[in-house]
């Protein structure tokens, strides 16, 4: 689940809390556990000390170690909004007419944010991802000692790069050593410093 509203639905399978339900502290974890969420995603804004405190209280946690963080869901298509058409409905054919959904949204400062289209019954929803990927491999030894499950999220990596990243993070879990090259533009998150 990525939205608290999803927790009100009856689920025939165990529910894991995704990035949208990220956990900052024990009180938040206890709240979701009371709603039968069996696995929780820790906030990417927690530092090493805060993570240790959270993990000490028990629970089943996963940490996003690699990938582009989803920043938002867009209910209004940037292409249609730019043209002044703010309606969003299933009759829209802009993507089909113009060769598909734009894959990149470039902001006024030149940052490039990948978009992924979800076609829904009522129209489209676009996932907007961070302009840089998170790659915590440079903290491999620290991640290993945290003894937490790691989530790897792929958006635009080639199958070869995906295999390389998966194998590398297996090394992080097993021995505290990452084997892949880290993109110079990647962010390593807040593990050492926290939010300033």
Tell where the protein language model's regions lie, with residue ranges.
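Active-site pocket-lining/capping segments in soluble small-molecule metabolic enzymes
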Residues: 1-31, 35-196
